[in-house]
Amino acid sequence: MLEQMGIAAKAASYKLALLSSGEKNRVLEKIADELEAQMESILSANVQDVEQARDNGLSEAMLDRLTLTPARLKAIADDVRQVCNLADPVGQVIDGGLLDSGLRLERRRVPLGVVGVIYEARPNVTVDVASLCLKTGNAVILRGGKETHRTNAATVRVIQKALKACGLPEAAVQAIDNPDRSLVNEMLRMDKYIDMLIPRGGAGLHKLCREQSTIPVITGGIGVCHIFVDSSADIAPALKIIVNAKTQRPSTCNTVETLLVHQDIAERFLPALSKQMAESGVTLHGDETVMQVLHGPAKLVPLKPEELDNEFLSLDLNVVVVENMDGAIGHIREHGTQHSDAILTCDMHNAARFVNEVDSAAVYVNASTRFTDGGQFGLGAEVAVSTQKLHARGPMGLEALTTYKWIGFGDGTIRA
């Protein structure tokens, strides 16, 4: 089954690569229109997925990731329309020039070909990835989690209907709807057909892909994000940033999970933090110093060492007191996932040091980690947030779904 999907996807990719920007945008507009027209069928499938997930005991954080509402689906359709407004990188001449030999050389952006994406309980990923791949002339094979298989299947049917209406092969966007996990291992070995693989899920999925895939893999999306409250931090705006980074949408990968507090500000800052977190419904997981200093009003539990490596994806926050900047940077190096980390400070020397020494995809000064997002960065919808260094890093927009080729123009030109 998968080999036939791969053959069809590869054939579709050759046709997509020849489309003009206008032709690709017309397809995306049609997809957005169909998502709204077929909203009832998609939401009906999603209700079934959510009910089964709840019966299976999924956490509230996971259920939130899984759930679609009319407003969320409308926003997804609008995101597709926003992709239409983005500049198409395909065909862009990155650099080049006339060589001494007389050869005119160009380095030109081209589609990757076929992209494979394995993801878990995020139904919006289906549309986000499909729209970005189509905009860049790539075919895509999707393998969503079993928790969303009905929603994904309904969504892909809508996308394929739009493709067919525009005279394009339905195989340009395909989904593996069989929940059999063995198919993931088979997909990981489809290097004959898939040019790049993107896993979006937990650490186990990323480890499996890194160890078993014969396809180039881009990993990311695991966000054990930190905020360091420096000794010079202004407490009121610091609290505002922390509330945003923790509570705006706790189930996202750019949500802060660990707060590092400089010991020189701890006795002044921690009581204010506790009051604010109590109002926000956040449970604090405190180290020994925090447990000694705080006695309410926020719910406070002792920090377990293994929690420093956890994505809570819920209203839980580790709080650790560190001796100095070295302690904060060392902690992030040991427990961070190179996703998004921030410093809150009024000392620009310390800010510069933090930016230079914290090796994460996104580093912030006096700002929330929640900004690590394709839309917020002006990239449009994102296919993933890469926490590695090749071939993309941070929110992966359109350019990350392209490669390049060298093109030489001669006139009977030969090498001397």
From Swiss-Prot:
Disulfide bonds: none
Reactions performed catalytically: L-glutamate 5-semialdehyde + phosphate + NADP(+) = L-glutamyl 5-phosphate + NADPH + H(+)
Keywords linked to the UniProt accession: Amino-acid biosynthesis, Cytoplasm, NADP, Oxidoreductase, Proline biosynthesis
Pfam families the UniProt entry points to: Aldedh
Entry EC number(s): 1.2.1.41
Enzymatic class: oxidoreductase
Keyword Amino-acid biosynthesis: yes
Source species, domain of life: Bacteria
Molecular functions (GO terms): glutamate-5-semialdehyde dehydrogenase activity; NADP binding
Subcellular location, record wording: Cytoplasm
Pathway noted in the entry: Amino-acid biosynthesis; L-proline biosynthesis; L-glutamate 5-semialdehyde from L-glutamate: step 2/2
One Gene Ontology CC term in the entry: cytoplasm
Biological-process GO terms, alphabetical: L-proline biosynthetic process
Function summary: Catalyzes the NADPH-dependent reduction of L-glutamate 5-phosphate into L-glutamate 5-semialdehyde and phosphate. The product spontaneously undergoes cyclization to form 1-pyrroline-5-carboxylate.
Family: Belongs to the gamma-glutamyl phosphate reductase family.
Name under which the protein is recorded: Gamma-glutamyl phosphate reductase
Record organism: Salmonella agona (strain SL483)
